[in-house]
Swiss-Prot record:
Gene this chain is encoded by: secA
Annotated positions binding ATP: Q89, G107, E108, G109, K110, T111, D514
UniProt EC number: 7.4.2.8
Official protein name in the record: Protein translocase subunit SecA
Record function comment: Part of the Sec protein translocase complex. Interacts with the SecYEG preprotein conducting channel. Has a central role in coupling the hydrolysis of ATP to the transfer of proteins into and across the cell membrane, serving as an ATP-driven molecular motor driving the stepwise translocation of polypeptide chains across the membrane.
UniProt entry keywords in alphabetical sequence: ATP-binding, Cell inner membrane, Cell membrane, Cytoplasm, Membrane, Nucleotide-binding, Protein transport, Translocase, Translocation, Transport
Subunit composition and interactions: Monomer and homodimer. Part of the essential Sec protein translocation apparatus which comprises SecA, SecYEG and auxiliary proteins SecDF-YajC and YidC.
Native species: Blochmanniella floridana
Length: 840
C-alpha cells in the first residue's frame, strides 16, 4: 500500500514539483563543476567574466552559460564571504532567471540568491536593476554584495533619492544597480519630462529583480506614482466645509440615541465609502446656503456645485474612515501617510482627490494646495516595461493567480534547506478586545519567565501602543517598532531574538532583516571600539550560550494581535520564526471586535459565538474558527484583487496613451533639427483650419472667410484679407486650394524671416523648447481630464452602459483631440515668434 502511494505521488507530481525536478538537474550540473572552480586561482576565477562576455558577443545565449556562471558565483561567494551557497539557493537563482517569482522562506538567504541571476544577466552589458522596498535595504544589500561583484569584475551602483543627475547616471550605467521601487519609477517619469537628453538618467529597461515582490507588485499596486505641481488654493473651502461636516457628525451622534430617527449618512466599511442620506443631503444644503457657499434654491448635485460635493464627500471620509495613528500620523504640522501593509511612514506621498487636504483641515494643520498631476504611472505598468522581470519573497503562493494573470509570472515554491519545525497553534478568539489583550499579556509573561523571545505583530501604531501600555502596567520590558521610529527598525528587529526579549512590531516593519536567535552577534562586534580577537571570541561564545538557551525555551514565539485582510501578511509575520530549521511557534489572538471579523466574517460565526453564551475571559480555540477566518480573508483578497485588476484595466488605457506621448517626446528630444517635423505639422494644421471654416470645396459665404481671417490673425499672427479680395477675384469662391497655398506661403515666409533674425541654431532650440513645453502642458491637462472622466464614469452604469467601454471610447476621443490641439498650439506659438521679435 505504501509503495502504491509513493508510485502514485511520483506519477502525479504537482506543477511545482515537476518544475523543481527539471531544475535540480541543472543544479547537479553546477555541483559537478564545483571542483573545477575550486582549482582556479583568484585571477582565473574573476577572469571568467571576460570569457563569458566574449562568448555572448559571439552569439551564445546566456541560458547556455547559466550552469558555469552560477558555479563561478558560488565559488566567489565562498572566497569572499566564507559561505557556500546551498542547493536551494541555486534553485532560487534558476527560478529568478526564468522570469518567475521564487517563494523562499525567511532566513533562506535571498540576498545572496539574487547575486546569481544578477551576475548572469549583467554579462549582457544592458544593466540589472535590483529593487528593494526601502533605501536602507538598497544601501545595505549593495554594500554587502559589492565586494563579490567587484571581485567578478562588475561595478555596482546605488540609486537613492536626492542624488544629482550625474550621480544617478553613474548608478544606472553600472552593471548592477540597487534602488527602491519608488525611485526607479520616479526616475522614469522625470526622464520623460526633461528638456535636454543629457538630463535623462535611465537607459533601456532590461532586467528587474524585485525583492519582497508581493509588497511592491501587489500591496502597493493601488497607489500610482505621481509627479505633481500645485494648483489653485482652496484651503478656505476645506476649512469651512470641515466645520459643516463636524456639525453633521455631531447631530448624527445625537440622532443615534433615538432608533426611530433616520441617520444623516451611512457608512460602508467594506468599500470605505460614506454616503449622505436624503435628510443628510437636505441638512448639508441648508448649512451651505447659510454659510454663503451655495445660492438659495441650488442643489448640491448641480453641475455648478460639483466641487462643493467633492469637498463634502472628502471631509466625511476624512472624519469617519481615516484615523490618526492608524492611517496617518501628525508630525511637525504635517500629515504623513502610514503604509497599511508595512506600518511604515511614507514621506512625500499624499492622498489624491482632495482627501489629504480634508484630513489637514480635520487635524487643523496647514492646508497645502491640491496638486495637479504632471506625470503618473502605476507600479503594475512601470515594471511591465522591463524586457525581463522576476521577483522573490517569503510569501507568494497565495497570490500566484494574480502574478500570473497580471504580470505573466509563474510562482515557484523553493524548498527550505532545513525542515521547518515551527509550531503554528490554532487561533484563539475572545468576545472583547480587552479580554484578548489580557490573554496576550499573559502569554508574553509566560514566555518572559522562561526567557523565550517574543515578537508581537500589530496592524497599526494605535494597536501597538495599546499593547505597549498594557505591558508597562505589568512591568514587562519591551521595545516598540512602528512608523514613528523607522530609522532604528533594523537594529531593534535584529535583536528581537535575545533571550526574554519582547518586541512589538507594526505589521511587517523590519522586513528584510533576519531575527537571529540569541541576538545579533555581528551588530555587537560592529559596536566594539577595539574589535580585537579576544573580544570577538567572547561575544561569539556569549551568543552561543544565549542561542542554545533560546532554542531550549522553544525559539522565537510570534503573537499576532489581529488577523490581517490578507493571509499573506499573516504568513509573513509567522515566517519571522522558525528560520533555517530553528525551533519556534506562533499564535493569533482574535476578538469579535476585530475589524476583519466585524466587517467580513460570516454571520454564522458571529451567531455561533453569541449562542455559546461565553463568560468574561473565556475563549474558543478550534480549527473550525481558523478556517472561518481564512474564508473571510479569501473574500477580502478576492475583493482587493478585483480592485487592483480594475485599476489596471483603466490605467492600461492611460498607459497606451502615455507610451505614445513619451515615445514621440523622446524622439523629438533626441533630434538636433526639428524643422522638418514643424513643416509637416504646419500642413496638417492648415488643412484642419480650412476644414473648420470652409468645410466644402467651394466658399458659400463671405462670413466664413471673415471668421477664417480672425482665426489666422489671433492665433497665427497672419493678416490676410481674403474677404476683400473676394469682391475683386470671384474665382476665390471655388478656390479653397488657392487659399490654402496662400496661407502656407505666408506662414513659411513669416517663419523664414524669424529664422534669419535669430539664426538656425537658436531657432532649433526655440522650436524644440516650444514643442516640448506644449507636449507637457497639454499632457498635464489631458491627465486632469482623464481623472475627471474616471471619477464619474461609474454613473454610466445607471444608463445600462459598460463604464469600462465608455471610458475607453471617450478617453480615445479625448486623446485624439489632444493630439490635434497639440499640433495647433505648436504652430500657433511658433507663428507668434515674429510678433515677439518685433516687440523687442
Amino acid at each position: 500500500m505504501i509503495f502504491t502511494l509513493k508510485l502514485f505521488k511520483k506519477l502525479f507530481r504537482n506543477r511545482n514539483e515537476r518544475i523543481l525536478v527539471h531544475m535540480k538537474k541543472i543544479v547537479d550540473m553546477i555541483n559537478y563543476m564545483e571542483k573545477d572552480m575550486e582549482k582556479l586561482n583568484d585571477n582565473q576565477l574573476s577572469n571568467k567574466t571576460n570569457e563569458f562576455r566574449m562568448q555572448i558577443k559571439s552569439g551564445i545565449n546566456i541560458e547556455e552559460l547559466l550552469p558555469q556562471a552560477f558555479a563561478v558565483v558560488r565559488e566567489s561567494v565562498k572566497r569572499i564571504f566564507n559561505i557556500r551557497l546551498f542547493d536551494v539557493q541555486m534553485l532560487g537563482g534558476i527560478v529568478l532567471n526564468n522570469r518567475c517569482i521564487a517563494e523562499m522562506r525567511t532566513g533562506e538567504g535571498k540576498t545572496l540568491t539574487a547575486t546569481l541571476p544578477a551576475y548572469l544577466n549583467a554579462l549582457t552589458g544592458k544593466g540589472v536593476h535590483i529593487v528593494t522596498v526601502n533605501n536602507y535595504l538598497a544601501h545595505r544589500d549593495a554594500t554587502y554584495n559589492q565586494p563579490l561583484f567587484e571581485f567578478l569584475g562588475l561595478n555596482v551602483g546605488i540609486n537613492l533619492p536626492g542624488q544629482t543627475v550625474c550621480a544617478k547616471k553613474i548608478a544606472y550605467e553600472s552593471d548592477i544597480t540597487y534602488g527602491t521601487n519608488n525611485e526607479y519609477g520616479f526616475d522614469y517619469l522625470r526622464d520623460n519630462m526633461v528638456f535636454n537628453v543629457k538630463e535623462q538618467v535611465q537607459r533601456e529597461l532590461h532586467y528587474a529583480l524585485i525583492d519582497e515582490v508581493d509588497s511592491i507588485l501587489i500591496d502597493e499596486a493601488r497607489t500610482p506614482l505621481i509627479i505633481s505641481g500645485p494648483s489653485d488654493d482652496a484651503s478656505l473651502s476645506y476649512l469651512k466645509i470641515n466645520e459643516l461636516v463636524c456639525n453633521i457628525i455631531k447631530r448624527n451622534i445625537d440622532h443615534c440615541k433615538y432608533p426611530e430617527k433616520e441617520e444623516y449618512f451611512t457608512v460602508d466599511e467594506k468599500s470605505r465609502q460614506v454616503v449622505l442620506t436624503e435628510i443628510g443631503l437636505i441638512l448639508i444644503e441648508k448649512l451651505l446656503i447659510e454659510s454663503g457657499m451655495m445660492g438659495m434654491g441650488e442643489s448640491l448635485y448641480s453641475s455648478d456645485n460639483i466641487i462643493l460635493l467633492h469637498h463634502v464627500n472628502s471631509a466625511l471620509r476624512a472624519h469617519i474612515l481615516f484615523a490618526c495613528e492608524v492611517d496617518y500620523i501628525v508630525k511637525n504640522g504635517e500629515i504623513l501617510i502610514i503604509d497599511e501593509h508595512t506600518g511604515r511612514v511614507m514621506p512625500g506621498r499624499r492622498w489624491s482627490d482632495g482627501l489629504h487636504q480634508a484630513i489637514e483641515a480635520k487635524e487643523r494643520v496647514r492646508i497645502q494646495n491640491e496638486n495637479q498631476t504632471l506625470a503618473s504611472i502605476t507600479f503594475q505598468n512601470y515594471f511591465r516595461l522591463y524586457e525581463k522581470l522576476s521577483g522573490m519573497t517569503g510569501t507568494a503562493s497565495t497570490e500566484s493567480f494574480e502574478f500570473k494573470s497580471i504580470y505573466k509570472l509563474d510562482t515557484v515554491v523553493i524548498p527550505t534547506n532545513q525542515p521547518m519545525i515551527r509550531i503554528d497553534f490554532p487561533d484563539v478568539i475572545y468576545m472583547t478586545e480587552i479580554e484578548k489583550i489580557n490573554a496576550i499579556v499573559s502569554d508574553i509573561k509566560d514566555c518572559v519567565n522562561r526567557k523565550q523571545p517574543v515578537l508581537v505583530g500589530t496592524v497599526s501604531i494605535d494597536k501597538s501602543e495599546i499593547i505597549s501600555r498594557a505591558l508597562k502596567k505589568e512591568g514587562i520590558l519591551h521595545k516598540v517598532l512602528n512608523a514613528k521610529i523607522h530609522a532604528a527598525e533594523a537594529d531593534i528587529i535584529a535583536q528581537a531574538g535575545y533571550p526574554g526579549a519582547v518586541t512589538i512590531a507594526t505589521n511587517m516593519a523590519g522586513r528584510g532583516t533576519d531575527i537571529v536567535l540569541g541576538g545579533n552577534w555581528r551588530s555587537e562586534i560592529a559596536a566594539l571600539r577595539n574589535a580585537n580577537t579576544h573580544a570577538m571570541l567572547r561575544i561569539k561564545s556569549d551568543w552561543k550560550e544565549r542561542h542554545d538557551s533560546v532554542l531550549k525555551s522553544g525559539g522565537l514565539h510570534v503573537i499576532g494581535t489581529e488577523r490581517h485582510e490578507s493571509r499573506r501578511i499573516d504568513n509573513q509575520l509567522r515566517g519571522r520564526s522558525g528560520r533555517q530549521g530553528d525551533a519556534g511557534s506562533s499564535r493569533f489572538y482574535l476578538s469579535m471586535e476585530d475589524s476583519l471579523i466585524r466587517i467580513f466574517a460570516s454571520n454564522k460565526l458571529v451567531d455561533l459565538m453569541k449562542r455559546m453564551g461565553m463568560k468574561s475571559g473565556e475563549s474558543i480555540e478550534h480549527p473550525w474558527i481558523t478556517k472561518a477566518i481564512a474564508h473571510a480573508q479569501k473574500k477580502v483578497e478576492s475583493r482587493n484583487f478585483d480592485i487592483r485588476k480594475q485599476l489596471l484595466e483603466y490605467d492600461d488605457v492611460a498607459n497606451d496613451q502615455r507610451r505614445v506621448i513619451y515615445e514621440q517626446r523622446n524622439k523629438l528630444l533626441a533630434m538636433l533639427d526639428v524643422s522638418e517635423v514643424i513643416h509637416n505639422i504646419r500642413y496638417d494644421v492648415v488643412d484642419r483650419i480650412l476644414n473648420i471654416y470652409i468645410p466644402l470645396e467651394i466658399i458659400e459665404n463671405k462670413k466664413d472667410l471673415i471668421k477664417l481671417e480672425k482665426c489666422l490673425k489671433d492665433d497665427f499672427n497672419l493678416v490676410l484679407s481674403f474677404s476683400e479680395q473676394l469682391d475683386e477675384d470671384t474665382s476665390l469662391y471655388e478656390g479653397k486650394e488657392k487659399i490654402r497655398v496662400c496661407i502656407l506661403t505666408e506662414m513659411i515666409k513669416q517663419y523664414k524671416c524669424v529664422k534669419e533674425m535669430v539664426g538656425i541654431n537658436v531657432m532649433n532650440a526655440i522650436e524644440k523648447g516650444i514643442i516640448l513645453k506644449t507636449f507637457d502642458a497639454l499632457w498635464k491637462e489631458h491627465l486632469a481630464s482623464m481623472d475627471y472622466l474616471r471619477q464619474g464614469i461609474h454613473l454610466r452604469g445607471y444608463a445600462q452602459k459598460d463604464p469600462k467601454q465608455e471610458y475607453k471610447k471617450e478617453s480615445f476621443s479625448m486623446f485624439k483631440k489632444m493630439l490635434d490641439h497639440l499640433q495647433y498650439e505648436i504652430i500657433s506659438e511658433i507663428s507668434k515668434l515674429q510678433k515677439l521679435n518685433r516687440s523687442n
